[in-house]
Amino acid sequence: MKKELETITYGEMPVQIGYCNGHNSKLNAVEYHRSSEINVAATDAILLLGQLADVAEDFTYDTSKMEAFLVPAGTGVEVFATSLHYAPCGVNGQGFQVAIVLPQGTNYPLEGAHQKVEQGKALSEDALLAATNKWLIGHAEGGLSEGSFIGLIGENLDVSK
């Protein structure tokens, strides 16, 4: 399976296969990558998705533009590089289990120096870079670490409501 994903889906690029599981019902943040991410739901899950094109010039994003999508157990979906997303949500208060396929090295610690968030502002997209191939915009209620850019405007969406 991994070899097929590397050869066909990712055009001979090495990939890493991991998982995300737990109990979540809130948006909390959005991230994006410069490459597609494959999600395969082992349990029913909800993905909250938005479009990178809707991020404002100051790198803020209006959460009312997000849409919720049910991913039934056993279903695989491609989350395009132009899609804002974050951790899946469970359905009806249940936990979720989702396998995640990304290019090798994605989400690894950064090795170089990058622009920092200054006085709550991201002066360039580089200030959003939180890990290798991972740009992140947080919500004030999302619990992200200090230094993260808090640029989600509006409600911290909750699929349990």
Where are these regions (language model features)?
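Active-site region of the double-stranded beta-helix
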Residues: 1-73, 86-161
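Tight coil/turn sites that cap or link beta-strands
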Residues: 73-76, 82
